[in-house]
Amino acid sequence: MLTLRSVMFPRLKPVIIALALIGFAVPATRGTAKEYSIVIEQKRIVERGSRIVIRNEYGDVRVAGSDRDTVEAIATNTNGSQAVPVTISEGSSGNQRVFTVSPVEGGRSARQQINLEIKVPRDVELEAIGIRRGNIRVMDLNGGVRLRTDEGHITVSRVGSPAGGLVEVMAPNGNVDLSHINGDVRIVAISSNITVQCVKGDVAARVASGHIEVSNIDGDVELNVSSGSAFFTGAIHSAGRYRLQTLSGEVSMNIPDTVGFTAALSSYSGQIHSDFQSPNATLANSTNRRIKHGDGSGRIELDSFNGSVSLRKIVASSGADCQR
C-alpha cells in the first residue's frame, strides 16, 4: 500500500544507514590523518663548512657523515615505536652558517627520552650541547666536533681530515671511546674510562676518577689521572713528548725500541720497572730513575705519587691497525 511517507521519502531507511556509516567513518579518517601528520623527518640543504648544533636534553644522539649536501634528522621515543616532531633552524655566527637540530619544544613530556638520528655532510663542524642524559655517537666526518653529555657514553670514529679536525669531549659521567681521529684530541672527564686509538694529532686527556688508555698516537701525549691508571701503547716519535701522570694508580708505557728517547720515571710510593737498561740509565734514588735510549731525542715522563711506574718494550709490529 502506498502511503504519504513512502511516496515522499522512498529509500529513506537506506539513506539514513548510509549517513550513519559515513558519520562513523569520518572521525576515524581524521584521526588517522592527524596521527601521520607528525613531522618524522626534517631535511635542510647545508653549505660546506657550516656548523651543526644539536640539542637534546634526554636521549641518545647518533650522527653520521654522508656525501649529500643536506642535514636530515629523525626523532623517535626510546623504544623507536613513535615518531617525535623535530626541527632544524638556521642562523649565523660571523660568516659561518649555523643549523640547530632539536626535538620540537613541547614534543616531549618531562624527562622523556627522545633519540635523534642525524645525517650531515662530511665537511661540517659538529657541536652537541645541552644533553643531560644520553649517549652520543659520531662517525665519518671531516670537520671538528665538540661533544658533551652530563651522563652518558661518547663514541667517535673516523673523524677529521688531512687539514685536521679537533675532537673536544667533555664527559662528567660516562665512558669515552675515540678511534681513527685525523686531528687533535682534548678530553675532560670526571668519572670515566677513556680509550683513544689511532690519532694523527696530539692527545690531551684528564679524568678525576677512572683510567685512560691510548695507543698508536702520532702526536704528543699528555694524560692526567687523579685516581686511576694511565696507559700508552705504540710507537713513539723522535720529536714526540709523552707525559703520563696519576696521583693514585698505575702508569705504564709500552713502546718499541726503534726510536731514541730520554725518560724520567718517578714514584713516591710504588715500584719502578723498565725493560730499557741502557748504560746511560741512572738511579737517582728509590723513587726516581732516568734512562737514555739511543740518541735520546724523544721525551718521556712517567709519574705516580702512589702506584707503580713501568716502561716496557714491545715489538714494533704490535698495536692496532689504524687504516680508516
Task: Describe each model-derived feature in a short phrase.
Residues M1-R324:
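Intrinsically disordered, low-complexity terminal regions
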